[in-house]
Amino acid sequence: IQGHTQIVFYDIDSCKVQQRIIIPKQGPNSISQTCGFYANSLNEIYVSDMFQNKIYKYNSRGEVLDSYDYSVDINGKNLRIISLQTLFDEPLVIKDGCIYGFQGISYDSFKDSPDGLNYEFNESPIAATIDTATKAVEFSELCYPDLYEKKKGYSYNESVSRIYDGRRFIYSFCLMDELYVTEDHKTVKLYPANSRYMDVEKEGVPR
């Protein structure tokens, strides 16, 4: 539909449309450009704004129930846009009334790239939480690991995927053989996850 975004739910058994939610681009329930969604239920649908640091909660009628501004955290630090476009490797997680969203490496964290290949950055949180009751925003204590060894010719790449098993968050980083497992984003346990079938030489990976 021109001028609208549609979220369509299908019934797997009947192969028919179960619910169609229209989000206009203008008006009180609008988002000018969506950046993915996460459905906790048909009456609790979280939609991300592509151009603003905001997540909106919609009901099945396409009405905004609430909105969450995450422009800055409680200490005044800027956040990056939380994208909900990729459901399989960066899903939104809602736990104990808090929204857990991904954070890319902070633009303010980059320090230097002496050779144009090895990018160095200060500690950068991997996630941020939004308390749906108080709307307080906090960065996680868990930060990106030292992704690349110096003088190896690796390009900067913050590619990371995450799953949540109902208790633990499990992170997998591009070009790293360990899985990072955490329950609270404060302490982390590493598990080796080398492939049994591939012996990939990482040096010289193209940018």
Give the residues covered by each predicted segment:
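Short glycine-/Asp-/Thr-/Trp-enriched loop segments that recur within the blades
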Residues: 26-32, 74-87, 148-155, 199-205
